[in-house]
């Protein structure tokens, strides 16, 4: 557990340093050539998704030491090439880890750790020589490192796109072809879904962000919902106060088939561009 926390703090520091190096986000300059130049000159090691540390309680049930927790996520990416592969793509590795920590119980047990490595091809989406977003094709693995009846794992081929509507709004779509090899979670698609849509909004000064993520489950008109609000500490950093609400199934792998409704608060360090979900 100590190694996990130390790794999390180390990667947060790396992300803070990266935000100072890359002072200009792609959405601020829509010329395609300038966007490629920014990408090729930017650090190879970056944040991938949001990196956060939040704690909270269930909604609709009495909070107890067993159902209240701390959740944290670290997510990094290493770009392996410049944007000079076929179709102006670039090769990258990513690693994302989510932890669910029962800090209110005796001995502070880590309830579940979800490991999500992947390798993919990224692409800047350009229309009429204007940058309008990004996409990627990735092979992912996700598991919780447990054995016996507590083991959970699956693989998927993911296709995702994030498109800028303007400097304030972005929409995202992500779909996947699942390869379920975990004997204890053969019905995971019923709960973790088959595709995801999201919308991001942020103010002109980047001080306030709002995100809504909907993950479509297999049954008709059923979604897992995540709503996020963040407010920046100050204008010169990418650290934010963070509020996250989750409602549905599949928040963690161990309890993927158990319904959760959780409200948590803490802080988040965001990538320079809009967040990826």
Spans of features found by a protein language model:
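Solvent-exposed N-terminal domain segments of exported/luminal and surface proteins
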Residues: 21-89, 100-102
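Long, repeat-rich segments with strong aromatic
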Residues: 205-210, 216-242
